[in-house]
A protein has these predicted regions:
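A residue-level marker of the well-folded mature domains of exported/periplasmic proteins
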Residues: 5-16, 21, 39-225
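Gram-negative bacterial Sec-dependent N-terminal signal peptides
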Residues: 19-38
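N-terminal regions encompassing targeting/leader/pre-sequences
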Residues: 1-2
Length: 225
């Protein structure tokens, strides 16, 4: 039930042996037939929980997802945590009470949803992590980009523009596994230049919650240090 016009990694986790199978595929409408999830039934209720709809990036995802799901007869209920994990937990509980069939979650913090998602699973609700990994929880699907490759491409572009000099590394939220994979990919490319003394890393910090304000403050401090 996930829409994305990109190449993604689909990780299916079986309930018994917790084996992970990574399948690279193009997702244009739904990811149901080849997974443990059934196809959408007419009238299926989907709870779409977004981390922060104040950001345009997530607004576009919401619109594309909702359009595709409703075209197949599903009903989508969307809520935004606006960057607050406590709010998101309450919203998940609300979706459980509403009796949704599927939860699609962009987690604000993918490490603290285990208890509330256990409640969802007890009610027979399918749980999908979208773009960001949900850890320490029994989820049915995880759909994301090849985040390590994204990080490599970022670093390659920077090295093409500035092959020598001082670099300040700014990461996203330390609670988001994507940010860590971005950094892994970046370092795959940057480390040889660092070892060769072409690049000097003068700072390495992370912006909690992907906060633009936090990132601005960190960078301003870095530039004036």
């Amino acid at each position: 039930v996930l829409l994305h016009q990109e190449i993604v990694h689909l990780i299916t986790i079986t309930r018994d042996e917790k084996m992970k199978k990574i399948v690279s595929m193009t997702v244009l409408a739904t990811l149901c037939a080849a997974t443990s999830l059934p196809a959408l039934a007419d009238g299926e209720k989907i709870g779409l929980l977004m981390s922060d709809l104040r950001l345009e990036r997530w607004q576009k995802d919401r619109d594309l997802f909702t359009s595709a799901a409703e075209a197949m007869g599903a009903k989508v209920y969307t809520q935004s945590a606006n960057g607050d994990v406590t709010t998101q937990i309450s919203q998940i509980e609300n979706m459980i009470s509403r009796g949704v069939d599927v939860l699609v979650i962009v987690p604000e913090n993918g490490e603290v949803l285990g208890n509330v998602l256990a409640e969802a699973k007890a009610e027979g609700i399918k749980v999908l992590a979208y773009d960001r990994l949900i850890k320490f929880a029994d989820i049915d699907l995880y759909v994301s980009f090849d985040n390590i490759r994204v990080g490599e491409m970022q670093a390659e572009a920077l090295l093409n523009l500035k092959p020598k000099g001082n670099y300040f590394l700014m990461g996203g939220s330390p609670t988001d596994n994507n940010a860590k994979m971005f950094r892994q990919g970046q370092m795959n490319v940057l480390q040889p230049a660092i070892d060769a003394k072409k690049i000097n890393v003068v700072g390495d910090q992370w912006a909690m919650g992907w906060s633009a304000e936090a990132a601005l403050n960190i960078m301003e401090n870095g530039l004036t240090a």
